[in-house]
Regions:
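Two-component histidine phosphotransfer core
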Residues: 243-250
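Peripheral, non-transmembrane regulatory/ligand-interaction domains of membrane transport proteins
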Residues: 1-222, 226-229, 233-243
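Bilayer-spanning, highly hydrophobic alpha-helical transmembrane segments
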Residues: 262-271
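Transmembrane helical bundle of ABC transporter permease
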Residues: 254-261
Length: 271
């Protein structure tokens, strides 16, 4: 699927693309490729002269190969975005390509993103950029806004963990816990621990991507300050994830203790 966006009166406007000639009539600032077909990739490569790596969204890429600049001026960033579904939490790799220097290429000033599935953060940004004029001025703003939205989405996930652990804490403090309930709670806590760890790793990844943008000197003064604010927000989330790790470990130890007490009671009864 090709999602092509132009800028009109300070708002992102999505344009339907049915064939190659549709691209030739547009001056987009963002071309978002979600599970693109071979034909759609060919359109983008042919019109913009873009080099899309075959392993653009691969998971087994070395860290050093995820942030780099090509000789033709293309800057490549590969970053993970969080998906927090009710059934599972996972990270999805997204490849970004941005050319801000080589004006000889049609890709200049356009952000290209390649991903394998729908991501909540992308929907959130599209909704905001349509409703809030002036939120986006250029392709770099789009990329920064995506990272900012990912931090906000991760913060919401942490808030959900806080709420769930608050309920568990109340039950543990009451002291009336059956073995069956304790096992259910342990499974839930393990799920929360996995999500918390994923958020922490995701924020580490986002920090590296934003830091790369700052080092590459692609940002103007206002965008540089926006990037610094994103890093400050990530630093704030780090302390929350550490607190949650400590709380999760405490609750796990408490529940295991209750299970041991219950088992000792059963042993005494039979002995």
């Amino acid at each position: 699927m090709l999602n092509v966006f132009t800028l009109s009166n300070g708002r992102l406007v999505q344009v339907e693309i049915d064939q190659l000639s549709d691209l030739e009539q547009l001056q987009p600032i963002w071309v978002d490729m979600e599970s693109p077909t071979r034909e759609e990739k060919r359109w983008v490569k042919q019109h913009y002269g873009l080099s899309i790596p075959e392993d653009a969204t691969g998971e087994d890429i070395e860290e050093s190969a995820r942030f780099y600049e090509e000789d033709n001026g293309e800057q490549h960033i590969r970053s993970d975005f969080l998906i927090d579904d009710e059934d599972e939490s996972r990270s999805v790799r997204v490849a970004f390509i941005l050319n801000q220097r080589n004006t000889e290429l049609k890709s200049c000033g356009v952000l290209f993103s390649i991903r394998d599935e729908d991501i909540p953060v992308f929907r959130l940004l599209r909704m905001r950029a349509r409703r809030v004029p002036g939120l986006i001025d250029d392709a770099k703003d789009v990329l920064l806004a995506l990272f900012d939205a990912d931090v906000e989405y991760s913060a919401d996930a942490l808030e959900g963990i806080y709420d769930d652990l608050k309920k568990v804490s109340a039950q543990v403090l009451e002291g009336s816990i059956t073995d069956t309930y304790a096992q259910e709670v342990l499974a839930d806590i393990a799920w929360q621990e996995n999500l918390n760890g994923r958020v922490r790793r995701n924020m580490l990844d986002t920090r590296r991507a934003v830091s790369f943008m700052m080092r590459s000197k692609m940002l103007d003064a206002e965008q540089f300050e926006d990037a610094r604010q994103i890093l400050r927000d990530i630093e704030s989330l780090d302390s929350h994830t550490q607190f949650l790790f400590d709380k999760i470990n405490f609750l796990m130890d408490a529940l295991v203790g209750f299970l041991n007490i219950n088992q000792n009671k059963i042993i005494k009864i039979f002995s």
